[in-house]
C-alpha cells in the first residue's frame, strides 16, 4: 500500500473511532469515505459498534454500505444526523471546502447540513491555502439550462465546461439526472461564502461544490519520517 492510501486508511479509522452506539451517521462519498465505510462495517460485525444506521450521500456509497451489511435509511426519513463523515477535494485553513469530484455534492451538502457534527477526512495532499487554484469547482445544473448558466458564470469571472463521461459518450449525469459544469477562476476563489451564494442564485443551478460554514473538524493523514499519523487541524 502506498503512502497516500496509508494516510487515507489511517484518517478513516480515526473518524470511525468517534462513532458511538445508536448514532445516525452520514456516510460520505469518494475513496477516503469508502475506507471509512469499510472500517465501520468491521466494527459493526465485531460488535464494537451497535445500533447505528447510515444515510449515504451517493448511490456508490449506498451499494458499498449495503454489501457490507450496514443498516441504512433514506435522507428523507431522518430529521437530524448525529455525525457525518466525508472526504473533500480541497480544504483551506478556514475549513472551507471544494467537494464534488464524484458529482455527489448535492446530497453531500444536504447530509452535512443536517449533521450535529461534520468531520472531513483527507490526506495532506488536499490541504490548500486558496481554493480552486488546482481543483475545479463543480456546479450541478439542469440539463436544459447549462448553456445559460455557463454564460452567466462568465460574468462572475469563471470559466465552466461540461464534465464529460469517461466510459460513455456525452456528459456525466448525476444521481439527480442533472449535468455538471466544472468551473475555474483564474486567480482562485477569494470569497467562498459570497461566491457560493452568487452561484446558487443563478436560475438553473441546483447546487455548487463550495462547502462554507459546515465543517466542524478536519482530520488529516500525514507522513513524518516515513511514519503515517493523523492530525486534527485547528481552524484559522
Swiss-Prot record:
The active site is at residue 108. GO terms for cellular component: cytosol. Keywords: Isomerase. SUPFAM superfamilies: D-ribose-5-phosphate isomerase (RpiA), lid domain (SSF75445), NagB/RpiA/CoA transferase-like (SSF100950). Its EC number is 5.3.1.6. Homodimer. Catalyzes the reversible conversion of ribose-5-phosphate to ribulose 5-phosphate. This is Ribose-5-phosphate isomerase A. The gene is rpiA.
